[in-house]
Amino acid sequence: FESVTAVDSINLTIQSGTYCCLLGPSGCGKSTTLRLIAGHETPTSGDILISNKNVTVRPPAKRGTAMMFQNYALFPHLNCLENVAFSLKMAGHKKAERNERAMAMLSLVEMQDLKNRLPSQLSGGQQQRVALARALVGNPDVLLLDEPLSALDPFLRKQMRAELKQLQ
């Protein structure tokens, strides 16, 4: 096998309230970089700073980040509303509050009418919108999106770009 270097060296400063897109060919380390920032991978050297705070050893839930994975990572046994509200439940929010916040995010991505459906009952684009709502519900400092528009049709892709810009 060839020697594989997963993200050799990177220094990246992103101003608050701005977009940053990582572009490159498949296998160049874009997803790995996002997973490192989110805390789902551990760097072998260097530090990860968010808002000038070293978060390198913090678990994902303590970093102020949310990641929407390329494969969506929705819980198959939970409906849309429960998927979006899950992190709020784990954080100890009361059911009424978490359902209200989850519904607001489902409305934002135009999935409120499908709140009771399981992921297996949704199209790829619908699953992607639920995953985005789940990433947004905790109001993260840093939102990490891995291929956020890939499963959307051209109309929804344009609409989602506008919604992401509005969230900025």
Regions found by a protein language model. Give the residues of each.
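Conserved ABC ATPase signature
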Residues: 118-122, 126
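ABC ATPase NBD coupling module
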Residues: 53-69, 90, 94-99
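Conserved ABC ATPase "signature" region
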Residues: 54, 89, 96-113, 163-166
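A short, proline-enriched helix->beta-strand linker immediately N-terminal to the Walker B motif
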Residues: 137-141
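Catalytic Walker B motif of ABC-type/P-loop ATPase nucleotide-binding domains
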Residues: 143-146
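Short coil-to-helix segment of the ABC ATPase nucleotide-binding domain corresponding to the Q-loop/switch region
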Residues: 78-86
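The feature captures the beta-strand-to-loop junction immediately N-terminal to the Walker
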Residues: 23-25
